[in-house]
A protein has these predicted regions:
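Gly/Gly-Pro-rich "capping" loops immediately C-terminal to redox-active cysteine motifs
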Residues: 24, 28, 40-70
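Short N-terminal micro-motifs specific to bacterial/archaeal maturation
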Residues: 12, 18, 58-59, 82-85
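Processing junctions and N-termini across compartments
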Residues: 15, 29-32
């Protein structure tokens, strides 16, 4: 019985979506170091309608881990590219953090 339980747990762990496998604490640290200057509390001081709030992310098709990772990696318009400044893991973590905070409306 214990073997079946362990097998089930191992299988379940392999099925965890990448956003949940991210290190949100690391994502928060990256966000504080690199993003908060323009995106304090999920806002946007450069383009006020393109915030990191859930509604705006959905409106602009940025509400998936892949979309946020792509814009962090490659940048777009006034958004700087971070592919040469952050590791893939940091990009994944900060993208997951952004989506997590957006889902919580940037409240603690």
């Amino acid at each position: 019985m214990l073997g079946i339980l362990l097998a089930f747990i191992c299988l379940w762990l392999t099925l965890i979506p990448p956003a949940f496998a991210a290190d949100l604490a690391n994502g928060a640290a990256v966000f504080e170091a690199r993003c908060v200057g323009c995106h304090v509390n999920g806002g946007n001081i450069v383009r006020r309608n393109k915030t990191l709030k859930q509604k705006a992310l959905q409106k602009f098709g940025m509400d998936s881990i892949e979309a946020v990772e792509a814009i962090v990696t490659n940048g777009k318009n006034n958004m700087s590219a971070y592919k040469d400044k952050l590791t893939e893991e940091q990009i994944h973590d900060v993208a997951a953090y952004v989506l997590d905070r957006a889902a919580a409306d940037w409240r603690s």
